[in-house]
Amino acid sequence: MQRNLVVLLFLGMVALSSCGFREKHFQRFVKYAVPESTLRTVLQTVVHKVGKTQFGCPAYQGYCDDHCQDIEKKEGFCHGFKCKCGIPMGF
């Protein structure tokens, strides 16, 4: 039962993140919805890692360039799942 709740919470967070909710909203939700335990710590870590990830980066080639032009007016480069503005790949 608890595993189903965790999966449901995670899928709900993924769905709501596309609506513009930020990481702090999900952290607050996890804090109040999940009792204090190792499970809460794991969920908060997952929310933090997912919040830092920019999924559009590897899927859409121009995502980082558009993102960095909006923020810093620099060329954007995809480094794994993160966009780096003005920092080309070091290969």
Swiss-Prot record:
The keyword Disulfide bond applies. One of its GO terms (biological process) is defense response to bacterium. Residues 54-91 form the BetaSPN-type CS-alpha/beta domain. Keywords: Antibiotic, Antimicrobial, Cytolysis, Disulfide bond, Hemolysis, Ion channel impairing toxin, Potassium channel impairing toxin, Secreted, Signal, Toxin. Disulfide bonds join C57-C78, C64-C83, C68-C85. One of its GO terms (cellular component) is extracellular region. The keyword Secreted applies. Its main location: secreted. It is found in: Secreted. Expressed by the venom gland. Residues 1-19 form the signal peptide. It comes from the Eukaryota. One of its GO terms (molecular function) is potassium channel regulator activity. InterPro entries: Long_scorpion_toxin_alpha/beta. Has a low affinity binding to potassium channels of rat brain synaptosomes. Displays weak antibacterial activity against Stenotrophomonas sp. Strongly inhibits the development of the Plasmodium berghei ookinetes. Displays slight hemolytic effect on mouse erythrocytes. Induces cytolysis on Xenopus oocytes at high concentrations. Is not toxic towards mice and towards the insect Tenebrio molitor. Belongs to the long chain scorpion toxin family. Class 1 subfamily. This is Potassium channel toxin MeuTXK-beta-1. It comes from Mesobuthus eupeus (Lesser Asian scorpion). The lineage of its organism: Eukaryota, Metazoa, Ecdysozoa, Arthropoda, Chelicerata.
